[in-house]
Amino acid sequence: MASATPAMSENAVLRHKAASTTGIDYESSAAVSPAESPRTSASSTSLSSLSSLDANEKKDEYAGLLDTYGNAFTPPDFSIKDIRAAIPKHCYERSTIKSYAYVLRDLLCLSTTFYLFHNFVTPENIPSNPLRFVLWSIYTVLQGLFATGLWVIGHECGHCAFSPSPFISDLTGWVIHSALLVPYFSWKFSHSAHHKGIGNMERDMVFLPRTREQQATRLGRAVEELGDLCEETPIYTALHLVGKQLIGWPSYLMTNATGHNFHERQREGRGKGKKNGFGGGVNHFDPRSPIFEARQAKYIVLSDIGLGLAIAALVYLGNRFGWANMAVWYFLPYLWVNHWLVAITFLQHTDPTLPHYNREEWNFVRGGACTIDRDLGFIGRHLFHGIADTHVVHHYVSRIPFYNADEASEAIKPIMGKHYRSDTAHGPVGFLHALWKTARWCQWVEPSADAQGAGKGILFYRNRNKLGTKPISMKTQ
């Protein structure tokens, strides 16, 4: 990203303005009268008028749409062809050698940190127990950062952005993700489904927001009451955030939490009688899960084998060196990895400016614009390989390797115009603040109060905390 978006008030939309990429003067072109046009026939004029009427009708169809900040919204009107054409060809090039260099760098960071702490942060060198506790706590944070970077490399493998060779990508990703207790192929397939259905209320596979009806059911309230409930207490918000950061990732793998729950529609019939939740038959470990197709079953088994080998290795190390040591060496850093994965993914897809679409109004281009870039400073750029900084372009062209994503991201901004979203204020501190802000602002989605026709199929975040655009009042309905 070339530059951070200037800090603005909380009610402002963080957007990049459209920039013209051609030398055409659209204003002077439009000012040419039919008589001066090279095509002066009646049919030409009539077609022009019809086109203008269609455009006006289309515009009116989406009038009255407001995001959570109260900004007017219209759906994207560019095409995926426009996006792909704007990206320089060399951005698509993948280098196996360069990718492995980053793997080695991350492994070196992990091993060097372990060596230094294991050999120097000892009772002999540091007699103070409190000081050793603080230093080993720092160790868990550092290892969590480095391991998250390695996890991101595995994510690259899942998109075949690691190498032109699918075999090399999958083998590398399987090893990396298995070591981090991630079922590689299982997650690869569900993540692919997420990319294909991003922003679709019936297809998206991750951080799909609740509808007003679902939120009311969760709270045990009538739908009409939701907008008039008292404000959620900050302590409740904080506890919810802590719980999500601790167990959000394993909960997603085991129950498909935050994914869609329309499994009855699985085309092979694998979703009949299955639903999200513990014991519901929807998870990332069972080859029969409706998340997958029958042809993918053998890869789910391979993912489970990878997890089995990793768990066996951890059990051996725990018995060999002690479980207290393993808690510090592996399991606490693992919790930090969980935290970063959930935080990054949540904030990539949740923001007061972002819409969601019903099935009838969704398409791939609109879905790709349901994402936002975030700035994590040095940590995001270098340790996390830019996964939060260039997520928008990643959703349009996922095979672009992360080391080319900055240039590709800059290339598509003029095409996306106002539909490109970024929140880059205050770096890592701003990122963590965004966790709190989105939890308070983004609680469910519903249509805009003044939406008409097709516009009712475009949903925006609302909340009970009296923040931003008010929810629809149903008292008189």
Swiss-Prot record:
Enzyme class: oxidoreductase
Motif annotated as Histidine box-2, chain positions: 191-195
Chief location bin: membrane
KW Ribosomal protein (keyword) present: no
One cellular component term from this protein's GO annotations in UniProt: endoplasmic reticulum
Motif Histidine box-1 positions after renumbering to this chain: 155-159
Pathway stated in the Swiss-Prot or TrEMBL entry: Lipid metabolism; monounsaturated fatty acid biosynthesis
Entry keyword set: Endoplasmic reticulum, Fatty acid biosynthesis, Fatty acid metabolism, Lipid biosynthesis, Lipid metabolism, Membrane, Microsome, Monooxygenase, Oxidoreductase, Transmembrane, Transmembrane helix
Recorded GO MF terms: oleate 12-hydroxylase activity; omega-3 fatty acid desaturase activity; oxidoreductase activity, acting on paired donors, with oxidation of a pair of donors resulting in the reduction of molecular oxygen to two molecules of water; phosphatidylcholine 12-monooxygenase activity
Domain notes: The histidine box domains may contain the active site and/or be involved in metal ion binding.
InterPro entries: FA_desaturase_dom (IPR005804), FAS_N (IPR021863), Fatty_acid_desaturase (IPR012171)
Any Pfam family matching the protein: DUF3474
Organism encoding this protein: Claviceps purpurea (Ergot fungus)
Sequence ranges of Low complexity compositional bias: 27-48
Protein name: Oleate hydroxylase FAH12
Biotechnology (record note): Mediates gamma(3) desaturated fatty acids (e.g. densipolic acid) and ricinoleic acid accumulation when expressed in S.pombe with a temperature-dependent toxicity, at 30 degrees Celsius but not at 37 degrees Celsius.
Function of the protein: Oleate hydroxylase involved in the biosynthesis of ricinoleate (12-hydroxy-cis-9-octadecenoate), that is present at high levels in C.purpurea sclerotium tissue. Exhibits delta(12) hydroxylase activity on 16C and 18C monounsaturated fatty acids (i.e. oleic and palmitoleic acids), and, to a lower extent, gamma(3) hydroxylase activity on ricinoleate.
Family: Belongs to the fatty acid desaturase type 1 family.
